């Protein structure tokens, strides 16, 4: 059996199309143009690529895009002042500070300073607490995208045994909450978990988010399971060749056992920016007292 490939390119395009339709509706019916502000500190090449992609996709969806670039040696107070300004700007519905920040800057203080209503990365403790309480919250984009991808395979996740490998604040913990909201039965595993392969073999859904290339082997996977690979690990090419991007799952092995699987690249990574647009539209609606949009 060869697994169905869950195509991030197709799914993310569908999500962006729904976002664009919702943006058009907000403009036409309410005179609202959702606005996303992205703050980039320093000139990290990978961050530059991400910011350009976010800017392009934001504009393609019909939203307003605001970029703020600061030098790597910017004082913490100046960065905090910019966050306060964006919090107060009615044209801005979403604020994203590109992480990681350069050394010497306090990321936690910056995240805490973002208005939870505009926290489209879903990292502010208020949003984390609301999510854990089953209340409306802006959710970290990668977990949100992971759930959307799983639901292209299964109309309902209710009652399914789901294993989340990884307990980060960015992916693992919010993913557990989203799965609980879907009424899945959830196990969370981490570096201290005993006999991880045995746990994997019991799971109908496996979400791998550990940041270790090809850690999850094919013989760990329950036949027919759905595997969502969140990992993106850059590894040196053979004999000095071009670097490769590998997931946390040994894809070639796992696809012969799983029922459905996401590739790396071409999987969850593409959903992250699409879900950033989703969160921006949701934030705009909530800020203006409108019902949650159909995205």
Curated annotation (Swiss-Prot):
Keywords: Amino-acid biosynthesis, Histidine biosynthesis, Hydrolase, Methionine biosynthesis, Multifunctional enzyme, NADP, One-carbon metabolism, Oxidoreductase, Purine biosynthesis. One of its GO terms (molecular function) is methenyltetrahydrofolate cyclohydrolase activity. Gene3D superfamilies: Leucine Dehydrogenase, chain A, domain 1, NAD(P)-binding Rossmann-like Domain. The keyword Cytoplasm does not apply. It holds the Pfam family THF_DHG_CYH_C. Its EC number is 1.5.1.5, 3.5.4.9. GO terms for cellular component: cytosol. It catalyses: (6R)-5,10-methylene-5,6,7,8-tetrahydrofolate + NADP(+) = (6R)-5,10-methenyltetrahydrofolate + NADPH; (6R)-5,10-methenyltetrahydrofolate + H2O = (6R)-10-formyltetrahydrofolate + H(+). Pathway: One-carbon metabolism; tetrahydrofolate interconversion. NADP(+) binds at residues 166-168, 191, 232. The keyword Methyltransferase does not apply. It comes from the Bacteria. GO terms for biological process: L-histidine biosynthetic process; methionine biosynthetic process; purine nucleotide biosynthetic process; tetrahydrofolate interconversion. Disulfide bonds: none annotated. Transmembrane segments: none annotated. Catalyzes the oxidation of 5,10-methylenetetrahydrofolate to 5,10-methenyltetrahydrofolate and then the hydrolysis of 5,10-methenyltetrahydrofolate to 10-formyltetrahydrofolate. Belongs to the tetrahydrofolate dehydrogenase/cyclohydrolase family. PANTHER family: C-1-TETRAHYDROFOLATE SYNTHASE, CYTOPLASMIC, C-1-TETRAHYDROFOLATE SYNTHASE, CYTOPLASMIC-RELATED. Homodimer. This is Bifunctional protein FolD. It comes from Rhodopseudomonas palustris (strain TIE-1). The lineage of its organism: Bacteria, Pseudomonadati, Pseudomonadota, Alphaproteobacteria, Hyphomicrobiales. The gene is folD.
């Amino acid at each position: 059996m060869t697994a169905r490939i869950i195509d991030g390119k197709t799914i993310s395009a569908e999500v962006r199309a729904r976002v664009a339709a919702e943006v058009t509706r907000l403009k036409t019916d309410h005179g609202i143009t959702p606005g996303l502000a992205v703050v980039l500190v320093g000139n990290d090449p990978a961050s530059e690529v991400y910011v350009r992609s976010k800017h392009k996709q934001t504009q393609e969806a019909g939203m307003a895009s605001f970029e703020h670039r600061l030098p790597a040696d910017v004082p913490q107070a100046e960065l905090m002042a910019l966050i306060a300004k964006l919090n107060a700007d009615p044209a801005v519905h979403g604020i994203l500070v590109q992480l990681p920040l350069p050394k010497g800057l306090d990321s936690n203080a910056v995240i805490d300073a973002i208005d939870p209503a505009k926290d489209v990365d879903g990292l502010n403790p208020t949003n984390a607490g609301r999510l854990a309480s089953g209340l409306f919250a802006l959710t970290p984009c990668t977990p949100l995208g992971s759930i959307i991808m799983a639901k292209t395979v299964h109309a309902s996740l209710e009652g399914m045994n789901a294993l989340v490998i990884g307990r980060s604040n960015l992916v693992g913990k919010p993913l557990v909450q989203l799965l609980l909201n879907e009424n899945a039965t959830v196990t969370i595993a981490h570096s201290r978990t005993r006999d991880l392969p045995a746990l994997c073999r019991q799971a109908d859904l496996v979400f791998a988010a550990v940041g270790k290339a090809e850690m999850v082997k094919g013989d760990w996977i329950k036949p027919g399971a759905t595997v969502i690979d969140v990992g993106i690990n850059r590894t040196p090419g053979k004999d000095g060749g071009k670097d490769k991007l590998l997931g946390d799952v040994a894809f070639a092995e796992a696809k012969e056992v799983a029922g459905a699987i996401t590739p790396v690249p071409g999987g969850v990574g593409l959903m992250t920016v699409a879900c950033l647009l989703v969160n921006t539209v949701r934030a705009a609606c909530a800020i203006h007292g409108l019902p949650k949009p159909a995205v």
